[in-house]
Amino acid sequence: MNISFVLAVYNKLELTKECYKHLRKIYPKSPLVISSGGSSDGTKEWLESLKDENLSFFHDDTRLTFSETYNAGIDLVDTEKLVLIHNDMVIGKHFLENLDRLLDENPNTLLSYTTIEPPIFAGHQRPGKVILDMGTGFDNFNQKMFNKYVKENKNKCELYDGAVFFMSGRKDMFIDLGGFDGFSFVPCFCEDDDFLIRAKLKGYKLKTTECAITYHFVSQTSRFSDEMKDKRQNIEIFSNRNFVRKWGIMISTFNQMGYQIQDEFTFKKFLIGITINDDSNLTLLEPFFDKINLGTIPQGYIDAEQSTTRYDLKSKFEDVNDVDVMIRLNTPLNQEDFNVLTTLRVTIPGYAVGQYEVGNLLIDIRKDI
């Protein structure tokens, strides 16, 4: 085999120890990279104490983003292929063998694996997710039930459309895509959707297999820690707003477009501005536009919002005519107009240069899109 495990951690040392112990029972000599971005709970010292010649590790005393921590781990991989895991997982038999083979058989593919989960988020559907209660932690994990499931499904290696963060691929693919985006998403959330979209736009196939299997305890990692519990909701909101600042549309819009299952998916980012009479809806509108003509620079809004993003908000209100498309809203914003505004980047490429009225919006397409 020519594939490595990559595990990124931030504190949660006892969880990491259990994950490592279970992984080494199945794969005692497989290459493993553990990347620690700012852990302060003894993780660094524990990593240094391990006598494991097949382990490489990275540690930074500074708190890194989720993306930066995984990117640092990926950099250390010296095999052709790699698979990303979490420390709240149990790896099943045949996991690496099946991924290694399937990646060889399916070039230019980002391949996700199956995660069995307890019914904590049963209503949330995604590729590769199987709801079966085999325990909520390492302390009550039903190993026999898990092994039985793995044995029954180890040969079901057909690929189906769709992928998620629980992914594998050739290291060259991760390099080609520039890794995960640690600039936009601080400290976490949305980096997986962003990566998958960029992979699809680069021509990689997004697939999932049933025959590489893990058990995922869910909500055990640092993103669900006591440290994060009071900040998690705001961080998720900020990351989603930064996703829109980057792409101009929401994750849900990409999903509605069915980007993962299209043979040839395209999405063109262009500069779009809006002219508005007042700042009453600025919080709603700002992430969707590259330039905003308000007639002034709203310093109060910038001061309140800038700490939630690394994007330069003041620049949005400068050189406001430097756009490919300008939208004018002369009436109070209603829900119908807002719905149009949030999906304009999808619909505009079908129109020629010119001016169009849609509801209360005047759309001035100044350049060929």
Language-model region placement:
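A recurrent flexible, glycine/aromatic-enriched loop bordering the glycosyltransferase active site
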Residues: 137, 147-172
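A conserved acidic beta->alpha catalytic loop
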Residues: 35-45, 281, 298-301
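Short aromatic/hydrophobic "clamp" motif used to bind/position activated sugar donors
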Residues: 82
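Glycine-rich, basic loop-to-helix element that forms the pyrophosphate-binding segment
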Residues: 60-77
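A short, conserved alpha-helix in the catalytic core of glycosyltransferases
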Residues: 160-178, 184-213
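Conserved donor NDP-sugar-binding/catalytic core segment of glycosyltransferases
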Residues: 89-134
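Short, acidic, metal-binding catalytic loop of nucleotide-sugar glycosyltransferases
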Residues: 21-30, 287-291
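A conserved hydrophobic helix/loop-capping motif in glycosyltransferases and polysaccharide synthases
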Residues: 3-15, 19, 26-27, 35, ...
